[in-house]
Amino acid sequence: MTAASSKKEVSTGTKLSLKTPKDFFTTLEKKGKVICDSQKRQSLISAYLKKAKQTAVDPELLDEVTYLVEYPTPLTCTFDKKYLDIPGPVLVECMKKHQKYFPIYSGASKPKLTNQFIVIADSVTPKNKQTIMNGNVRVLTARLEDAQFFWEADKGVALKTLIPKLDGVLFQKNLGSIFAKKERVKMIAQWLNKQTGNQVSDKLIKDGADYCKSDLVSQMVFEFPSLQGQVGQLVGQIQKLDPAITTAIRSHYLPHHYEDDCPKDILGSLLAVADRLDTIVCCFENKLIPTGSQDPWGVRRAILGIIAIIQ
């Protein structure tokens, strides 16, 4: 039999001879450099991460990388320390989401992000190892250069000046902009606050609702949408906003999924419930009702999020 070539050049087209069919997997692994057993591939990757003392490994990233490689070879790479000035969540986003790298942390009790990462590569040989490592560092560096530019630009822009720009971001057809949505969220949160004993001031709710979506028009969130809330919190802290507001900018998006944490602050909880209630009502008003197979606006997730928060 002949092992088929691939874009990754895992095989070389060498003819592999089998004495019996049961020799297929072992022969393919030894001579064709393809490990067919996904569990074995994942075990090899996990063992290396454990050896590198990385315990907080993203299981979704681990699963994804397992199925991206045929003969995993972990390589530890290093990028310039100057990029550690970029906020940690942004660095991690660049590494994990875009490049499928595993960030390396130092310290067990208080993990601190380092300027190293682990890339799981295919077809590594002594001759091409350094070339592969240099290539991955070069690609990540380009990402980090962009991230650094966006971060420097965003932190110099007052979040307050971004709020009016939300009027140019569509929430849903027939239901206005994100600016209109945050105004509805403000009214709902004020009502919820009254129903629960006025736990926070009316002014704090108004300010929290105004700021909670402000980073959606930042350059960083435009490039990295999953950082919504986190960017606003970080920029707000630099600009000395009320700590309750900066916390709520991030926490009102929680929980992201059923295993996620819920907001631990009152303002964030009120805004989180109000935001989800608005989304649910708007979707039903717009006939965007979830079915057994479709829920593009995450209505079910919003409902489950409210239940988790109020429990």
Residue ranges and their predicted role:
Residues M1-Q311:
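Amphipathic alpha-helical "coupling" segments that flank catalytic cores
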